[in-house]
């Protein structure tokens, strides 16, 4: 080994354990003292909520001074409402057992009212459960004296209206006080102060209308229908006249005008149809009859060359017009009587078709062309 390394090794002093601890722990932590470690051990301080942070920075984004001064309170959890205490529970609270319990529990009052209230609530629950299970006559009488009479529900009102419908309907001339209750389904009028006792007793109606009983204190029915029928009588239906049977004079006057306006095409005569189909433009007639030739050219060619073609086309026009008019008559007859459909089907239609007509026109034009060529040859 070199001598320099031995000299450095001999110069190193032995390190004590106290020196090792002081060198490992920084000096700034030692100067902070024991409070620093206690704060680290404690839980983190409560962080501000979003509402509180917005409340602190409200002046940055709000211009109104009223809004800045107003403070938004945090939302509190809903407090559970106490159940309502019935009169029987109030009487149980005033019983000597609870009074003795309250007198003996003076130490509980000194400690605080909360434990005493919880004990009372538990005792009340036990009393209510026991009172619901036991049904004694004295308790029913006592509750009937304290509680007001129950109001009639929908079923009782329905029974009352059903019983009112069973009453005999008075004559129209007499001023009977039962006119308001004679109709089925009408609600009875509110009872006055004089009839308050009679309104408390309800009518008990059985399944059949013949068995009708009254409660004590109610007025008897003045008139009851005979017991032969097992259902309440239905009111007579008003006679409504059929709308088609009765017609006003205005409707009768409006009907012919409307009928004429709806079907104007069926009122045409044969002459109208013939005029309609014979009103053809002069150019079309000249083309089909004389191949569009001028009168001078027709005189040069000779009218006898066009006589046969003219007769064919004119007869075709007459027949087509008569056929259309006969078809219209057949449609009118078929609408009025269904038997004419069979006769129309049995009738053979006119034999000239569009193809045959075109063939005749082409043949006629070809004959004209041949006549022109023969005339040119004769002139040469």
UniProtKB/Swiss-Prot annotation:
Q: Where is this region: Disordered?
A: 92-272, 327-347
Q: PTM Phosphoserine: at which residues?
A: 248, 311
List, as start-end ranges, the regions of compositional bias called Basic and acidic residues. 153-162, 336-345
Q: Where is the signal peptide?
A: none
One GO cellular component, as annotated: centrosome
Tell me yes or no: is Nucleotidyltransferase among this UniProt entry's keywords: no
Composition-biased stretches (Gly residues): 100-110
Keywords carried by this UniProt record: Cytoplasm, Cytoskeleton, Phosphoprotein
* InterPro entries assigned to the protein according to its UniProt record, in alphabetical order: FAM110 (IPR025740), FAM110_C (IPR025741), FAM110_N (IPR025739)
Q: Which domain of life is it from?
A: Eukaryota
Polar residues bias locations:
127-138
Q: Any idea where this protein resides?
A: Cytoplasm; Cytoplasm, Cytoskeleton, Microtubule organizing center, Centrosome
Which residue stretches does the UniProt record annotate as biased composition, category Low complexity? 239-248
Pfam families (UniProt xref): FAM110_C, FAM110_N
Q: Which family does it belong to?
A: Belongs to the FAM110 family.
| Full protein name | Protein FAM110B
Native species: Bos taurus
């Amino acid at each position: 080994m070199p001598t320099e390394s031995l000299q450095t090794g001999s110069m190193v002093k032995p390190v004590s354990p106290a020196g090792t601890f002081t060198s490992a722990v920084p000096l700034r932590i030692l100067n902070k003292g024991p409070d620093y470690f206690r704060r680290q051990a404690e839980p983190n301080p409560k962080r501000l909520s979003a509402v509180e942070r917005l409340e602190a920075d409200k002046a940055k984004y709000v211009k109104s001074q009223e809004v800045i001064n107003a403070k938004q309170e945090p939302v509190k959890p809903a407090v559970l409402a106490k159940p309502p205490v019935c009169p029987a529970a109030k009487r149980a609270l005033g019983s000597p057992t609870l009074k003795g319990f309250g007198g003996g529990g003076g130490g509980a009052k000194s400690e605080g009212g909360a434990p005493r209230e919880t004990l009372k609530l538990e005792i009340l629950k036990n009393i209510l459960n026991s009172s619901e299970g036991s049904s004694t006559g004295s308790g029913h009488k006592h509750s009937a004296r304290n509680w007001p009479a129950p109001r009639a529900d929908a079923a009782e009102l329905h029974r009352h209206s059903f019983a009112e419908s069973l009453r005999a309907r008075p004559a129209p001339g007499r001023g009977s006080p039962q006119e308001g209750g004679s109709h089925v389904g009408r609600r009875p009028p509110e009872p006055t102060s004089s009839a308050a006792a009679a309104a408390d007793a309800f009518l008990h109606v059985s399944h059949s209308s013949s068995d009708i009983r009254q409660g004590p204190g109610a007025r008897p029915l003045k008139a009851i229908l005979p017991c032969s029928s097992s259902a309440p009588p239905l009111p007579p239906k008003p006679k409504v006249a059929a709308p088609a049977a009765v017609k006003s004079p205005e409707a009768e006057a409006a009907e012919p005008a409307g009928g004429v306006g709806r079907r104007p095409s069926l009122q045409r005569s044969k002459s109208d149809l013939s005029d309609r189909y014979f009103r053809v433009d002069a150019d079309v007639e000249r083309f089909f009859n004389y191949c569009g030739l001028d009168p001078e050219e027709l005189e040069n060619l000779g009218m006898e060359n066009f006589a046969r073609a003219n007769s064919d086309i004119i007869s075709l026009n007459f027949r087509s017009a008569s056929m259309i008019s006969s078809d219209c008559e057949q449609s009118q007859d078929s609408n009025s009587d269904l038997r004419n459909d069979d006769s129309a089907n049995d009738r053979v239609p006119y034999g000239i078709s569009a193809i045959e007509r075109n063939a005749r026109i082409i043949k006629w034009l070809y004959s004209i062309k041949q006549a022109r060529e023969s005339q040119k040859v004769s002139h040469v």
